Amino acid sequence: MGTRVRIKLEAITGKNTEIVALLNSGAESPEPSIVIPTEIAEELRLNELKAETAYSEEATRYVKVKLYKKAVKGTLLDNGEELTSVILDVVVVEGLIEPLLTDSAIDAFNIEIISFSKGLWRIRGESKVRESV
């Protein structure tokens, strides 16, 4: 099943959108990052910003990606309630099927995954268990 959460993205370009992102602890990043497809990057008008070229290790190969440092504020949502907010680097991957949060972003949002397969999670220190969207 996987665990997915709703995130409101507010770009430094002034554009906003809400997305559903997969929590992927196997996606490692030194800074809190969200990985998005080109279409969402275009919606946020990130192409107006200067991107760094970076390479992402994916299983048996490296993939060229665009990296926008501290380009969005991400706010974790649950049924419209704003839970936590984090400034995120944005990694844009052409052909990506669904957005994902990296390990350091999951930690920065204080998300504690209870069950990956059942899609259960909570905010660290809270007892309320939430379900994947």
Predicted regions and their residues:
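Pepsin/retropepsin-fold aspartyl endopeptidases
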Residues: 1-133
